[in-house]
């Protein structure tokens, strides 16, 4: 008997495929049955080798050894997933396996994960590709019935390979170069550093902003409505107008214009717009939203989340009304639901995957069992579908121009004619939406008629600086980066991809370059002193959002077969070579790069400073360190962050709430810090009541 080997990206997805295919016999690392073997990767099983694999001299960091630009790339099996790779290699090379199906995630990274395992295992068998946008059983069956030769995805693989190797070369060379120049570890990334630079630039704009006061005279009409004068920079001028207006009994209508306007429904979600709304409405980080969406996808409740499209293909038009009606019934919005399918259909704007949708499985699911975060994301996606196919929001706007005391005043009024899609949005998301103050209706007046003035007052305001970046605004900036410098006919891709932007933000936070400040719904992202210092010493080509956006656009062209991979890689290598040969240390920069002192070493009394991987004693022979990736805290379900480190160094103890036991139970405890005889840190637990 011969088998087809199916390789998924993770165990849970492999189990879902196995169930549909009838491979019900569970083995060590795979499922078997009905002519199928179904196994899985666990993320990236195969990774790019570190520099020292190419040459032992690279163990030591030296500018003289740069640039490091491999001619023949080498890969290693990840140590943590070596067993699973061994299982896959054995399955791939079994004599009774006659073909392999790549069933990893249908995107750039999923393609790379499979191809690297396939090549590292030395497999030569025919490969077909499974391409899914939904994990529903009928979608899985349809996908396996329409497998394509993997060669159709060679361009996608080439783009993934170029992205991985470019990131490696920029990260390895730039990090070593600047670390050596400034005598301390500095992490530099192709995408990470330009994003950090954007936040530093925004904070510089805010710091340089000088607010200017302005003054406005406001008239209240007896028949309803208010009118505003122009802005005055001098208070005395506004006060003079106010005095004159108070002497007048009325204002003369110079112009009255009434227009009917409409606001079209919003487009369906792609991942980035979902992440932006989830941050704005729910306070979720981009990574939290991606995690919740991925879980919903694997539970078959939404379609593939890592999409950059906001439209659907023509073949989906027939089933969409039923999906919308079913979704409306679940979320209490079925009343007066009108489905305009063509508003969301545009196959020409669909790339690898169509826009995010809830699936038909939502109607059969026990939604009460969903975690709160997942339910909130599902509600956003459902609401967006119903709004996107709904009626326009229609209103009548009246604009009055009046004259009082020789000065022009403007008033706007608004009357809603049809709530349209906004009524659905309020039904499904009403508790999340901020209540905006709508313009009141204005009296029905004619030109040259007189409006009695009920009152007049002076209002003071001031110009506002740019807003601090939160995740919503930063994601938007990443998405549109470089657009102004590109030709009009070039498709904008921005910095990163929908699948990687969240990870970029998290990496900047974890490495201490950005910090989140504020409460959950109003958290902003601020560059730390360390982040500002890094950007200060980085040359333009490393921190330029425009250059990074241009690279992303070229990766997209490679993916579409419009550009040769070698051309892109040559450009990256030339940039790195130029960087290494022309960059010198910035004078006075070392003062900016000082390590932050957070406390006193309990072992020797020297300063403890923060570095990338932990808090280290500055005294050379002392071995005291608090690792950020600390195993003791991991076992408690906690992370050793700067607040905890500060408490431990100051008080020798820190109280933690909701620690997790091995059995999943939660408890409160106090962590005590002491030192081993050789100076290394040692932790113990103290429980309430001395237990």
Model-based region annotation:
Residues 1-164, 168, 438, 465:
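Intrinsically disordered, low-complexity regulatory segments
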Residues 2-5, 81, 92, 120, ...:
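Basic, low-complexity terminal or inter-domain segments flanking catalytic cores
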Residues 11-18, 35-38, 42, 78-89, ...:
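Amphipathic alpha-helical transducer elements in NTP-driven molecular machines
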Residues 73, 95, 137-221, 258-259:
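C-terminal or mid-to-C-terminal helical accessory/interaction module adjacent to the motor/catalytic core
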Residues 104, 276, 306:
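Short glycine-centered, acidic/aromatic-flanked micro-motifs in structured strand/loop junctions
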Residues 235-269, 275:
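Metal- or metallocofactor-binding catalytic centers and their adjacent structured scaffolds
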């Amino acid at each position: 008997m011969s088998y087809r080997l199916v390789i998924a990206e993770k165990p849970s997805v492999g189990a879902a495929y196995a169930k549909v295919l009838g491979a019900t016999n569970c083995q060590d690392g795979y499922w078997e049955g009905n002519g199928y073997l179904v196994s899985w990767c666990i993320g990236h099983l195969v990774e790019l080798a570190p520099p020292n694999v190419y040459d032992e001299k690279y163990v030591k960091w030296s500018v003289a050894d740069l640039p490091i630009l491999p001619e023949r790339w080498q890969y290693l099996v990840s140590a943590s997933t070596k067993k699973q790779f061994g299982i896959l290699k054995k399955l791939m090379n079994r004599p009774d396996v006659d073909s392999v199906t790549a069933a990893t995630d249908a995107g750039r990274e999923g393609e790379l994960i499979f191809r690297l395992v396939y090549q590292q295992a030395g497999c030569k068998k025919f490969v077909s590709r499974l391409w899914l946008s939904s994990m529903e059983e009928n979608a899985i069956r349809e996908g396996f019935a329409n497998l394509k030769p993997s060669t159709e995805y060679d361009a996608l693989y080439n783009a993934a390979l170029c992205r991985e190797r470019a990131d490696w070369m920029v990260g390895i060379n730039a990090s070593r170069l600047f670390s050596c120049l400034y005598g301390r570890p500095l992490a530099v990334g192709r995408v990470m550093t330009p994003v950090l630079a954007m936040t530093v630039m925004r904070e510089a704009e805010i710091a340089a902003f000088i607010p200017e006061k302005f003054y406005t005279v406001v008239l209240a009409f007896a028949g309803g409505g208010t009118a505003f004068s122009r802005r005055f920079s001098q208070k005395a001028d506004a006060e003079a107008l106010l005095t004159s207006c108070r002497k007048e009994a009325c204002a003369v209508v110079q112009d009255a214009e009434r227009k009917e306007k409409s606001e079209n429904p919003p487009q369906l979600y792609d991942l980035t717009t979902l992440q932006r709304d989830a941050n704005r409405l729910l306070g979720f980080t981009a990574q939290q939203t991606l995690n919740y969406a991925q879980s919903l996808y694997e539970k078959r409740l939404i379609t593939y989340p890592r999409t950059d499209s906001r439209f659907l293909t023509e073949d989906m038009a027939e089933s969409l009304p039923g999906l919308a009606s079913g979704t409306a019934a679940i979320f209490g919005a079925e009343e007066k639901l009108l489905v305009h399918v063509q508003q969301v259909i545009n196959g020409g704007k669909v790339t690898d995957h169509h826009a995010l949708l809830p699936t038909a499985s939502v109607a059969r699911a026990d939604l009460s069992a969903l975690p709160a975060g997942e339910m909130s994301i599902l509600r956003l996606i459902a609401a967006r579908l119903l709004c996107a196919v709904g009626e326009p929001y229609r209103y009548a706007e009246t604009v009055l121009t009046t004259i009082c005391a020789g000065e022009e005043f403007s008033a706007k009024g608004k009357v809603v004619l049809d709530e349209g899609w906004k009524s659905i949005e309020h039904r499904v998301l009403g508790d999340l939406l901020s209540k905006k103050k709508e313009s009141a209706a204005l009296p029905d007046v004619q030109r040259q008629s007189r409006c009695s003035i009920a009152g007049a007052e002076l209002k003071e305001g001031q110009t506002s600086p740019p807003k601090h970046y939160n995740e919503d605004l930063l994601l938007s900036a990443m998405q549109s980066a470089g657009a102004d410098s590109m030709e009009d006919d070039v498709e904008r891709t921005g910095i990163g991809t929908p699948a990687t932007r969240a990870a970029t933000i998290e990496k900047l936070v974890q490495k201490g370059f950005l910090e989140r400040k504020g409460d959950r719904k109003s958290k902003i992202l601020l560059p730390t002193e360390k982040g500002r210092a890094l950007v200060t010493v980085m040359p333009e080509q490393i921190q330029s959002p425009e250059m990074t956006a241009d690279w992303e656009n070229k990766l997209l062209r490679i993916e579409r077969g419009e550009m040769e991979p070698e051309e892109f890689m040559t450009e990256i290598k030339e940039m790195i070579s130029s960087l290494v040969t022309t960059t010198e240390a910035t004078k006075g920069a070392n003062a900016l790069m000082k390590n932050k002192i957070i406390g006193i070493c309990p072992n020797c009394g020297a300063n403890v400073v923060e570095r990338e991987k932990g808090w280290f004693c500055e005294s050379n022979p002392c071995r005291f360190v608090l690792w950020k990736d600390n195993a003791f805290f991991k076992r408690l379900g906690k992370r050793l962050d700067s607040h905890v480190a500060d408490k431990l160094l100051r008080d020798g103890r820190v109280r933690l709430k909701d620690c997790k036991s091995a059995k999943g139970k939660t408890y409160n405890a106090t962590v005590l810090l002491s030192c081993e005889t050789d100076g290394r840190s040692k932790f113990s637990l103290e429980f309430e009541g001395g237990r």
